[in-house]
Amino acid sequence: MTRSSGLGLGIAMIWFSALVLIPLMAVVVTAIDGGWDVFWSTVTNGQTAAAIKLTVFTALGVTVVNVFMGTLIAWVLVRDRFWGKSVLEVMIDIPFALPTIVAGLVLLSLYGNDSPVGIDIANQRPAVFLAFLFVTLPFVVRMVQPVLEELDRDVEEAAASLGASRFTTFRRIVLPSLAPAITAGAALSFARGVSEYGSLVLLSGNLPFKTEVTSVRILSSIENDNVPAAAAVATVLLVISLAVIVLLNVIQRRVAARG
């Protein structure tokens, strides 16, 4: 390692530590500062456990949907030509551009009490799923799309000329190349989902044991001046998110190896 590269690494690590590692460590320390009994009683509290369960399982479900639909949308954008393609390219990024509270208002206007399409899911669990789905849609699409654009289609054509079916070509050639991008998009989708708050405020109603998610539960603890409880819930989410990311990486490596 040269002196200049060592300096760059040092600056990068200091910056990363200041922005990410130290704040995360502070949250964990705050969570266990009151003792393990307090930590355990907080995260196993009925209302808190229900919020964690709803958040994690909804985020997992949304991630699965995004993996399939996001990859499909990316495929259509790259491989197909159709009228309105440029408009779709722009609209995919709308969830990125909209403030989450505005996203909540958009969804409430369409799926609330006065729904113009006759679908009212406000203050129900499907509202949580829909809100998560809306704000996480672009992640897999935007991770997979550039990889698809760079794939050598001659290899796919060669496989087809040798008698490989479209499914076999996709499974053995395309999917292993897309696996890292799909994994990254899935990880971002899950992380974005478990942290969502703004779009849920108007749409889900934040009803305990029904539609309350962990971000709302954390905010409630802070408003009640119970920072250790908020930190405890945040720590549980952190551990779960890290576990999911590790699992996704394992799956990605196995898919790539089989390809």
Language model feature labels by segment:
Residues A18, K53, F57-M69, I73, ...:
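Hydrophobic alpha-helical transmembrane segments of multipass integral membrane proteins
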Residues M1-T2, D37-F39, G61-I92, L105-G112, ...:
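Transmembrane-helix boundary motif in ABC transporter permease subunits
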Residues G46, V201-V246:
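Interhelical loop and adjacent transmembrane-helix boundary motif
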Residues W36-T44, A49, G84, A103-F134, ...:
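Membrane-interfacial helix termini and adjacent extracytoplasmic/periplasmic loops
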Residues T2, G6, V27-V64, V76-D80, ...:
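Periplasmic/extracellular loop-to-transmembrane helix junction in inner-membrane transport proteins
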Residues R3, L7-I11, I22, Q145-A160, ...:
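C-terminal transmembrane helix and the adjacent membrane-cytosol boundary/short C-terminal tail
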